[in-house]
Amino acid sequence: MFWLKSGLFAVGLGMSFVYAIIPPLARDLGLSEIQASFIFSLSAVAWAMTSAPWGRASDKYGRRNIAILGYIGYSISMIILILPIYLADKNILSAAFVFPLLILGRTIYGLLGSATRPASFAYIADITPKSKRTKKFARFESNFLLGTLVGPLLGGYLYLISALAPFIFFSILGIVVAMGVFFTLENKPMKVSEIPTSKLSRLAPTVWPYLVFASVLSLCSASLLQSIGFYLTDNFNNLEDITLLISFTFVLLSISTIVSQNMFTSMFNLNNYKLLIYGCLILTISYCVMALSDSIATYFSSIILHGVGLGMVRPANSSGLSIAQQPEYQGEAAGHLGSVLPIGHILTPIVAMPLYIYNSSLLYFASGILCFILFVFIVFHPIFKYRYED
């Protein structure tokens, strides 16, 4: 378990740092907001296409082997992401190759890194009774969020030493985690008689409502993540150390999400239905405050509210999907969920960033409306109220 938790922590480190550093780097390289988003969107397409197959593969061949493959892909992608920028800066590589190579680095992450999450969460589902799964998922997810908290800070410090340093460090960390998982986690592939003869359909009544919820939430979250750097740069460029402000915003988001996840699943022990409806209402309010913010303090307050809402709905939705499935479909269910999580990053360059360019407030108001629609969807769809026993 330690190495699986460390794996999510390591992936969170790299992911949050990349989100924080790409917008200012894109500006320095002369890339537009849409080009910067496109770097992430192709990776998201690759992730969406491969997540469910990796989940099925973890059911068949074991959680450990598939998770290791994901860590290796993550490590490779971190190196490929920074290498073209470094070489172009040294006039070794033509600037014309930088954008395609950035896309390549993130695409590798999408193709292989997508194996980590379904394998890891399916392993947790394997060893956890249904009654404790929401709490367990929340605590497990907290390791990833802790990584997103530390990533911009640690990465920013290492970046002061060298542009290569944070990417090399995060890459090595991924390899170390892969080795730790290999030597400590027993691989238990299914017996031939246990392998399901049919696939778990995305359209199954116990699956599609959770996927719809995750898809809409993904669009709202991705549009925020990819616009934070640009929003602060465009609206508060009179403030000093804008890069530190961007990193601090991600830190606030991560801290509030971690605290929310552990508080509402452990201390208050709210059920999934309450977590979802309260969380959606808080997210709706956060986006409206964000759209109306005219000071950095107000914007930070909206980010904290957003983290609280995310901390409630994420573990509730993922555990709800897991609880509704039979044991032999845990990997595939986690894979289906993983396949829709990148939808936001796919659609953001097409839908969100053009809206942001037109008017950033409209983007956040639109996200608030979508979160309220999710609230209505949860209230009226019976599956979110249904309780599955162990």
Segments (PLM) and residue ranges:
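Hydrophobic core of transmembrane alpha-helices in multi-pass small-molecule transporters
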Residues: 9, 92-115, 298-312
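Helix-to-loop junctions at the C-terminal end of transmembrane segments
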Residues: 50-63, 259-272, 356
